């Protein structure tokens, strides 16, 4: 088990781990209310990466990581994750729907 200190390093190594073996990689979130800590874990049973935080601002980062993993799982491990963003892109796409006149 390796606790990664930097968020960017955790995301990069997690994506590499998933791309190495997509069928065996798991992603787990665990929140301990009594300690106020959130632990994110990515493992493929050979290597285990963990990131621990107690900052509320990291929730947005966690949402972006979820979107990255969803893209990797649905579109395949070869997808370009630089085009994956958070909630903003989804809201922009929904805002475009329904504009204009019905015919």
From Swiss-Prot:
InterPro entries: Signal_recog_particle_SRP9/14, SRP9, SRP9-like, SRP9_dom. Gene3D superfamilies: Signal recognition particle alu RNA binding heterodimer, srp9/1. Keywords: Cytoplasm, Ribonucleoprotein, RNA-binding, Signal recognition particle. Signal peptide: none annotated. One of its GO terms (molecular function) is 7S RNA binding. The keyword Transport does not apply. Residues 81-103 are annotated as: Disordered. This is Signal recognition particle 9 kDa protein. It comes from Zea mays (Maize).
């Amino acid at each position: 088990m390796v606790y990664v200190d930097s968020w960017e390093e955790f995301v990069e190594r997690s994506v590499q781990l998933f791309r190495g073996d997509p069928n065996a990689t798991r992603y787990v979130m665990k929140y301990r209310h009594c300690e106020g800590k959130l632990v994110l874990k990515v493992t493929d049973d050979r290597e285990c990466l963990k990131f621990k935080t107690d900052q509320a601002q990291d929730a947005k980062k966690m949402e972006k990581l979820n979107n990255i993993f969803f893209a990797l799982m649905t579109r395949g491990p070869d997808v370009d994750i630089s085009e994956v963003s958070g909630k903003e892109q989804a809201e922009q796409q929904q805002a475009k729907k329904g504009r204009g006149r019905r015919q």
